[in-house]
Amino acid sequence: MTSEPSLAPDFQVSAWLNAPEPPSLAALRGRVVVALAFQMLCPGCVQYALPQLLRVRRAFHAYRVATLALHTVFEHHAANSRATLEAFAHEYRLDAPIGIDAPDPVGGPIPRTMAAYAMQGTP
C-alpha cells in the first residue's frame, strides 16, 4: 500500500542571503528544486556538497532548476553567526539563495526546518 504524496514543507528560516525576495517552495512549484542542507563547519559540506550544488546551479537554467541552500546550525552555535556565514558565502562564491534555518522555539539544538524534514545531520 502506498500513501498519497505530500508536499515538502516550506523552509522555516530566520533570514535569506543572496535572495532579493525570500524564496518559497510554493512559488517554485512546477520546477525542479535542488535543496542542500549544510553547515559551514562541516568538512564534507565544504569539500563535496557545496561544490556539487554550484555545479548544478551552473549546468541548468534557473527557470527550470532552482537551487537553494539551507544553513542548519545544530552544533557550535556561537561560531555559526550570520556575519560568519556571509563571509563564508563570499569566500566560497556561493551565489545560490541561502536560508538560515530558524532556531528551535523552545531552545533545543535542532533548528526548525531540520526537524521538519527529520534530518539527522549534514550534508
Model-derived segments and spans:
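N-terminal "domain-start" segment that seeds a small globular fold
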Residues: M1-A26, A96
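Short, flexible, glycine/charge-rich loop motifs used to bind or transfer phosphoryl groups or to couple energy/partner
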Residues: M1-T2, P22-L25, V56-R58, A87, ...
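Proline-centered helix-kink/hinge sites
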Residues: P9, P43-G44, P51, P97, ...
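Residues that form or immediately flank small-molecule/cofactor binding pockets and catalytic motifs
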Residues: W16-N18, G30, T72, P103-D104
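Short active-site neighborhood of thiol/selenol oxidoreductases, capturing the structured segment around
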Residues: P22-L53, T67-L68
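Loop/turn elements at helix/coil->beta-strand transitions in domains of secreted/extracellular proteins
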Residues: G30-V33, Y63-A66, R93-P97, G121-T122
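Structural microenvironment flanking redox-active thiols in thiol-disulfide oxidoreductases
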Residues: V46-Y92, P103-I110
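Thiol/disulfide oxidoreductase modules built on the thioredoxin-like
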Residues: Y92-L94, I100-P123
